[in-house]
Amino acid sequence: MPDTVCRPPRLILASSSRYRRALLERLGIPFDVVSPDLDETPLAGETPAATALRLAGAKARAVAATIDAPDGVLVIGSDQVATFDGHQIGKPGTHERALAQLVSMQGREVEFHSALCLYDSRTDNAQVEDIVTHVRFRSLPEAELDAYLRAETPYDVAGSAKSEGLGIALLDAIDSDDPTALVGLPLIALTRMLRAADYPLFATTRGDRA
C-alpha cells in the first residue's frame, strides 16, 4: 500500500539569536536554523511597530528564498524593537552604553514590540503579529546595575537586561499577553500560527513528523 501520510513542511527559524532558538526548542518540534542576511536599519519616519513587523517578514521571506524545498517550508521570522521616551533603543554593545541605558530607565517604563511572521512558501502566505510588552524598571543604585552587567553581560539585548535570567531582578513589572515575547519569540502567537498552517504540533512522536 502506498504511503499516503501527508508530511508537514520543513520548519525553519530565520534567526541568529540563541535566545529565540532556545525558546523554540521548548516546543520539542524539529526545526532548522538559518541566519538571514538583512539590513535591519529602521526606515525614516517608521514607527517601532512598523519596523519590527517589516523586519520579521523580511527575514522570513529572505531565508525562504534560499531554501530548495519542493514540498514547501514554513519559515519563522521575528524582530524586536524597544522604545523609551519616544525613541527606539538598540542593543548597547558595550558595558558603558548598557550602564547608561539602565541608569536612564530606572523607575521608568520601556515598551517592547516583538513582531512575528510565519511565512508559508506553499501558499506565499505570511501570518504576522506584533506583541507589545510594557516593562517597568526598578530604581536601583548604579553600583548594583554595574554589578549586574558584569555578571550577565547583556550587551546583545535591547534594554540591557535579560528577563529570562538575573535581569529579572532589575524589573518591577511586566505587562504582556505573551510571557515569552519579551525574550524575543512569542510562543503563544507562534503556536496559533502553526495551527492555522496545519502544522501537527501534537504529533505523538517526533517520528510522526519525520
Curated annotation (Swiss-Prot):
<dbReference type="GO" id="GO:0047429">
    <property type="term" value="F:nucleoside triphosphate diphosphatase activity"/>
</dbReference>
<dbReference type="Pfam" id="PF02545">
    <property type="entry name" value="Maf"/>
</dbReference>
<feature type="active site" description="Proton acceptor">
    <location>
        <position position="79"/>
    </location>
</feature>
<feature type="site" description="Important for substrate specificity">
    <location>
        <position position="19"/>
    </location>
</feature>
<keyword id="KW-0963">Cytoplasm</keyword>
<feature type="site" description="Important for substrate specificity">
    <location>
        <position position="80"/>
    </location>
</feature>
<dbReference type="InterPro" id="IPR029001">
    <property type="entry name" value="ITPase-like_fam"/>
</dbReference>
<keyword id="KW-0546">Nucleotide metabolism</keyword>
<comment type="similarity">
    <text>Belongs to the Maf family. YceF subfamily.</text>
</comment>
<comment type="function">
    <text>Nucleoside triphosphate pyrophosphatase that hydrolyzes 7-methyl-GTP (m(7)GTP). May have a dual role in cell division arrest and in preventing the incorporation of modified nucleotides into cellular nucleic acids.</text>
</comment>
<protein>
    <recommendedName>
        <fullName>7-methyl-GTP pyrophosphatase</fullName>
        <ecNumber>3.6.1.-</ecNumber>
    </recommendedName>
</protein>
<dbReference type="GO" id="GO:0009117">
    <property type="term" value="P:nucleotide metabolic process"/>
</dbReference>
<keyword id="KW-0378">Hydrolase</keyword>
<dbReference type="GO" id="GO:0005737">
    <property type="term" value="C:cytoplasm"/>
</dbReference>
<feature type="site" description="Important for substrate specificity">
    <location>
        <position position="164"/>
    </location>
</feature>
<dbReference type="InterPro" id="IPR003697">
    <property type="entry name" value="Maf-like"/>
</dbReference>
